[in-house]
From Swiss-Prot:
The gene is cbiE. Keywords: Cobalamin biosynthesis, Methyltransferase, S-adenosyl-L-methionine, Transferase. Pathway: Cofactor biosynthesis; adenosylcobalamin biosynthesis; cob(II)yrinate a,c-diamide from sirohydrochlorin (anaerobic route): step 8/10. This is Cobalt-precorrin-7 C(5)-methyltransferase. InterPro entries: 4pyrrol_Mease (IPR000878), 4pyrrol_Methylase_sf (IPR035996), 4pyrrole_Mease_sub1 (IPR014777), 4pyrrole_Mease_sub2 (IPR014776), CbiE (IPR012818), Cobalamin_biosynth_MTase (IPR050714). GO terms for biological process: cobalamin biosynthetic process; methylation. Belongs to the precorrin methyltransferase family.
């Protein structure tokens, strides 16, 4: 059985008991280097996931008789690896154990409700700045290519510099920082972040 577990934004201290139990019973464990390092005592086979998703799919396919757990950042189905694995193997063959997404964690820390929030991501994908500008409350996971500064620049160009950006940096880590800034004032680089954009009207 293939199981995909959400690790939350920073590691095992935010994982569910079900996720930790799945890892305890796994024959093989796959994930990014940072994720695998959270489980130094795991004695089974390991696969370090890089940019080549095809290599992961082949590795899993060759071990279908084993209990495989794939470690996913945040929540596996919020712009995560779980989506790709379900599409490839089918939901009948994949068990998803949810995790806390970076967006959920940031909203909890900042006291921002998610009831009317538009969710998206610029992590490894293109984002529509027109859609960002047209929604009153947006939350997204970002990356180095399209981070808070790049998003702010595009919003200012669309007349949205008055809006508020909440930037969660290194979430759930010892060096976590949460910044509240007008979009027009965002002009720095931030590490491993999620962003909420609010319309102050």
């Amino acid at each position: 059985m293939l199981t995909v577990v959400g690790m939350g934004p920073a590691g095992r201290h935010l994982m569910t008991p079900a996720a930790l139990e799945a890892i305890d019973h796994a024959d093989a464990l796959a994930g990014g280097k940072r994720h695998l390092a959270q489980f130094p005592a795991f004695g089974g086979e390991r696969f370090t996931l890089g940019a080549d998703i095809g290599a992961l799919l082949s590795w899993i396919a060759a071990r279908r008789d084993k209990g495989i757990v794939v470690l996913a950042s945040g929540d596996p189905l919020f712009y995560g690896i779980g989506t790709r694995l379900v599409a490839h193997f089918g939901i009948e063959q994949v068990r998803i154990i949810p995790g806390i997404s970076a967006v959920q964690y940031l909203c909890a820390q900042a006291g921002i409700d998610m009831n009317d929030m538009w969710l998206t991501s610029s992590h490894g994908r293109c984002v529509s700045f027109e859609q960002l500008a047209n929604h009153r409350k947006v939350a997204m996971v970002t990356d180095a290519r399209c981070g808070p500064r790049e998003i702010a620049r595009e919003l200012v160009a669309r007349g949205k510099g008055h809006r508020l950006m909440v930037i969660g940096e290194n979430l759930a880590m010892e060096n976590e920082r949460i910044h509240w800034l007008p979009v027009s004032a965002v002009n720095a680089d931030y590490e491993m972040n999620a962003v909420v954009i609010l319309d102050e009207r």
